[in-house]
A protein has these predicted regions:
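Short glycine/serine- and small hydrophobic-enriched flexible loop segments
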Residues: 41, 82, 125-126, 205-211
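Glycine-rich cofactor-pocket loops
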Residues: 1-25, 41-62, 147-159, 175-191, ...
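Aromatic- and histidine-enriched alpha-helix N-cap/loop-to-helix transition segments
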Residues: 27-34, 72-75, 194-201
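Amphipathic, well-packed alpha-helical segments that form the structural scaffold of globular domains
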Residues: 37-40, 44, 78-85, 144, ...
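C-terminal amphipathic alpha-helical interaction region
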Residues: 130, 146-262
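Short amphipathic alpha-helical segments with heptad-repeat character
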Residues: 23-26, 67, 74, 162
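Acidic/histidine-rich catalytic neighborhood
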Residues: 4-53, 94-113, 117-118, 123-130
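Alpha-helix capping/hinge segments and adjacent helical runs
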Residues: 38, 60-138, 233-256, 261
Length: 262
């Protein structure tokens, strides 16, 4: 309900920043779920498909994306839980509200399995270089080939998506090249790379959601309108983070490694 309260004060839902925060939470969570469904499908293919080559390809994708799901998703869980607390103001910090318990419960998740930095290192030093970089390149090629359409309604989303996909390709090539001579650059940029891969992969999952949403739109307009509007927020407000992480990483590691700690 977006109407004002009876005493003349605005409900918090009428404030643009509250709405932004809620949509940030919603667009990330729903995109993560869609990507997890895709990853679960790849797991099934890797185990049960009759063709050996197809099984191996799916297994490679699961291996590539596992650090992303473990690391980025738990980092975002902390961001989202913190935002949920923030929306409630001081009351969100109290025990009887419940969000502070969720925050404390979630805080361990980025530390599980060797911490998220270890997941990022595993991605860039092992998964990215595996099979001479063929896995990431094959993944990018498959995504690009799948994300083509004559649907005019999806094309604006694809335009933004393809720009970020190109950024991910440049980032992957940069990391692969630096791994040969400048391992500090790779290590310093590992978290940034993982996040870029993650945000672009979530966008890929949203493209798949949009394809269904526009195809089946007449069957449930309210439901699919919600999906389309949520995807639009993700592409406008969240996906640009991918470019930011790329620019941060390619600045290198010299400042980091030369800094004198007391």
């Amino acid at each position: 309900n977006n109407s004002s309260s009876k005493n003349g004060a605005d409900f918090i839902i009428e404030h643009a920043d509250i709405r932004r925060t809620l949509l940030n939470m919603k667009s990330i969570i729903e995109g993560e779920r869609a990507l997890c469904f895709w990853l679960s499908q790849q797991t099934e293919v890797s185990l049960n498909h009759p063709d050996e080559k197809t099984r191996q390809e799916a297994s490679d994708y699961v291996s590539l994306m596992t650090p992303v799901v473990k690391s980025l998703f738990t980092d975002l869980a902390m961001e989202i839980t913190s935002d949920a607390m923030q929306i409630h103001g001081g009351y969100g910090y109290t025990k009887d509200q419940g969000i502070e318990q969720l925050y404390r419960d979630n805080r361990i998740t980025p530390i599980y399995e060797g911490t998220n930095s270890v997941q990022a290192s595993d991605l860039v030093f092992r998964k990215l270089s595996n099979k001479n970089g063929n896995i990431i390149n094959k993944f990018l090629d498959q995504v690009k080939s799948e994300c083509k359409t004559d649907n005019e309604k999806i094309k604006p989303f694809l335009s933004e998506f393809n720009k970020n996909l190109d950024t991910l390709k440049k980032f992957s090539d940069w990391m692969t090249d630096k791994a040969k001579t400048e391992k500090d650059d790779v290590s310093a940029g590992a978290n940034d790379y993982l996040k870029t891969l993650g945000y672009v992969s979530i966008a890929y999952a949203w493209i798949k959601v949009l394809e269904v949403s526009f195809k089946d739109y007449e069957e449930n307009k309210n439901f699919y309108n919600d999906k389309i509007d949520t995807a639009r927020f993700y592409f406008d407000k969240v996906l640009p983070r991918a470019e930011h992480h790329y620019k941060s990483a390619i600045s290198g590691s010299s400042n980091i490694m030369n800094f004198k700690f007391n």
